[in-house]
């Protein structure tokens, strides 16, 4: 359709004269318009054919861009670069994140120790070179799945392994630091409190028993800690160094503000060695000149005394106080007994014992003869006066005599004797009827006019 330029009447394209006003249309203009419309239609067809190709090309460009973006952040080389940058920049939080596993959480302080250990024991330049070479070889290898970076001394410091793929195209590299167990072996039951894996941790170790305190990645550690024992609470550090271990464990050195006490006794020569005790802060312990007592906190005073027995009597020293300001890691102290008082008492008791022993020697000499006579004559009356009537021993001997089962004895020797009120305990060495030497313990009662009678006996 076209419009008459004179009257505006609509007419078909092939009409030459306007039916309204008689205006004659220009045939060349119609031809041009027809040609132009055909060109536009042709161009539209071409454009419609090009759109899918353009879209495809655009998507391809996007895929290529996305691939390179993913490659920059997910290729083995990119993963390596992330770890290297974190170590180079002392980014302990990033290193902690990269090294943490489900089984072993690494905190930032542990990562800080690890970074320093790498720089000291491998060297940053060497570490970066070893890491890149290791990743490259693993990435190219069809068989190898893991390898270790080592220190100059040959200790493993980082495990690099393949762990599946990322986005189909890239090997996923896993970086894991090997761990060891630091171990403690306290002299007494001890509770340790410290921070590990970003959390507070408590470990209770029994006396003289090897106890691990956790799993740690390589490093030289000085961990702030508190420890508690029966002697008190201590502030200090747990120290351990991976360079000092070639096994799965590493010994812990304790560095706490503590004092150990060495005790020397004077004036104690007359005391029984087994009876000597040391009391520190109200806690009594056996004494040994070679023993070190403790540890004790250095921030509190210590009270100390000693005791011991001689002839059944307990003697004590004066109680001394060691001020906190005088406490050192190794602290020596001397405690003095009143040797003159002890010697006077021992001398007095020895005289009494000699008198008692003489009485017992006389008594058991007569008793052994009476015992043997009762056996030979089957007559309890021979021995009855030596045994207290009504006692279980009296009835037992009487029964044995009647049955002919009484044992003959000879050569009694008094080994030891003690008197407590009217009761006497004596250890007597005898020869039995089989010719064997036996020690028996007798209990006697001292009655009126110092008369002695047996009330009990037992094998020593």
UniProtKB/Swiss-Prot annotation:
Superkingdom, taxonomy of origin: Bacteria
Residues in compartment: Cytoplasmic: 1-49
Residue intervals of every C4-type zinc finger in the record: 4-21
Keyword set, alphabetical order: Antibiotic resistance, Cell membrane, Membrane, Metal-binding, Transmembrane, Transmembrane helix, Zinc, Zinc-finger
Bilayer topology term: Single-pass membrane protein
Transmembrane portions of the chain: 50-70
Any single GO BP term: response to antibiotic
Positions in the Extracellular compartment: 71-460
Pfam families, A to Z: TcaA_2nd (PF22813), TcaA_3rd_4th (PF22820), TcaA_5th (PF22819)
InterPro entries on file: Mem_prot_TcaA (IPR023599), TcaA_2nd (IPR054529), TcaA_4th (IPR054530)
Primary role: Plays a major role in decreasing resistance to glycopeptide antibiotics.
The family this protein is said to belong to: Belongs to the TcaA family.
Protein name: Membrane-associated protein TcaA
UniProt organism field: Staphylococcus aureus (strain ED98)
